[in-house]
A protein has these predicted regions:
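Classical eukaryotic N-terminal signal peptides for Sec-dependent ER targeting/secretion
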Residues: 1-10, 384-386, 401
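N-terminal signal peptide
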Residues: 10-25, 397-401
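Concave beta-strand-loop units of leucine-rich repeat
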Residues: 22-37, 45-59, 66-101, 105-147, ...
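C-terminal low-complexity, Ser/Thr- and acidic/Pro-rich disordered "stalk" regions positioned immediately N-terminal
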Residues: 329-376
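Cleavable C-terminal sorting propeptides in eukaryotic secreted/cell-surface proteins
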Residues: 376-401
Length: 401
């Protein structure tokens, strides 16, 4: 009788101990060192890291949720990475410096906190879930062979950075809200088209080396909107954008001929310069307030901001052509007190277009000028150190004598 009572208790205790043991192993960080790892956890509470020695094809099956990070860096012999079970990664999904990786398939993945794909020279496309990844906080895709990003189906993101992907000539996104920064730079050999037809609000937007950028539903930019070094961009329109909080910039866009902001009423700093073919600046019919300064420089033949009634900063306008009529507009605004800072307007200025007006390609890397400055700084440091060393040596010799 007692045995019959004790036996179930012993079995139950054994099951509890085994479950506790399994739970402990699923709470630890896991390092993968072979191509078909056994991970008997539905939920991994730590990180999963792939060892640099793994080569060929790697399948990670078993876990459905990773509450830590999935890190695959410097695994230079890896050709294929896949999982049919992982549906969410609560930390970073990081793939960097995988020189041979050509296949990436996570057929159940729907959610990831931070996605980093960088320096993947052979990776041409992504396969994420049946509907793609639908939730992410930050995404960075840099220096890859990717030509298709249809696996990303995000509605809201904090930060999205896409740069230096030479084969990426089209990015069509369903994003509605960007709470921090959108950076699209140096993709598609200057011929990239970006379609963000659902985007309504954004904080910071930085665009370089694109040929087309479409945001028909955009209504508000809570930081800045910047177009710099877009040699193939010929026009831009924001038909529903009413407010830009910090700054609006068009700089060094060689083929730019038209910009249109038909309902924009308020902006921060306004800068339009070094756009050699932009001869008519008439795209601000409702702009009344500029909370900052104005810098306009180019080959303008016509400049109109008819409703402008307040500029809280200074105004500096210059053109290689005769814009005396528009200069009178700013002179009168200054005399009325509508311009609170300094005001200067110059016609027929041969230096109105700067040296960078070729609209040349930009990139995410530093410029040669920066390198030269760094070299000069380094030389200065060496010179100072040598001088200090010389003084120290002389002082030492004096003491010896």
């Amino acid at each position: 009788m007692r045995f019959n009572q004790i036996l179930p208790a012993v079995i139950a205790l054994g099951a509890t101990v085994k479950a506790q043991s399994d739970d402990d192993s699923c709470s630890e960080d896991i390092t993968i060192r072979d191509n078909n790892p056994t991970i008997n956890c539905e939920v991994v509470r730590g990180d999963i890291t792939v060892d640099e020695s793994v080569a060929g094809e790697l399948n990670i099956n078993g876990p459905e949720e990773i509450r830590g990070n999935l890190i695959v860096n410097n695994v230079t012999g890896l050709i294929s990475l896949s999982s049919s079970t992982i549906s969410s990664i609560n930390g970073r999904f990081e793939l960097q410096d995988l020189t041979l990786l050509s296949n990436l398939q996570f057929s159940s993945l729907r959610s990831v906190e931070d996605l980093v794909l960088a320096r993947l020279a052979q990776l041409g496309s992504l396969t994420f879930g049946t509907t793609g990844v639908t939730r992410a906080s930050t995404i960075r895709i840099s220096d890859t062979h990717i030509s298709d990003l249809s696996g990303l189906r995000i509605a809201t993101v904090d930060s999205l950075q896409i740069d230096n992907n030479d084969r990426l000539v089209l990015f069509s996104s369903d994003l509605v809200n960007i709470t921090d920064t959108l950076q699209i730079i140096a993709n598609g050999n200057d011929n990239m088209t970006v379609e963000m037809n659902q985007l309504e609000t954004a904080a910071e937007i930085q665009i370089s080396n694109v040929a087309n950028f479409e945001v028909p539903a955009l209504t508000e930019v809570s930081a800045s909107l910047k177009f710099e070094n877009n040699p193939q961009l010929s026009s831009f329109s924001a038909p529903n954008l009413t407010e830009i909080a910090e700054s609006l910039t068009f700089n060094n866009n060689r083929e730019l001929r038209n910009i249109s902001f038909p309902v924009l009423t308020s902006s921060g700093d306004l800068t339009v310069e070094n756009n050699a073919n932009l001869i008519a600046l008439e795209g601000f019919p409702e702009l009344t307030r500029i909370e900052g300064g104005v810098r306009l420089a180019g080959n303008f033949e016509s400049v109109e901001i008819p409703e402008l009634s307040l500029v809280t900063g200074g105004v500096n306008v210059t053109s290689s052509t005769d814009i005396e009529e528009f200069c009178e507009f700013f002179d009168d605004a200054k005399s009325r007190g509508d311009i609170r800072g300094e005001e200067e307007c110059t016609s027929e200025d041969p230096d109105a277009i700067g040296e960078e007006a070729d609209g040349g390609s930009g990139s995410g890397s530093g410029s040669d000028d920066d390198d030269d400055e760094d070299a000069e700084d380094a030389a200065g440091i060496v010179g100072v150190n040598m001088a200090v060393l010389t003084v120290a040596v002389l002082a030492g010799l004096t003491q010896l004598l």
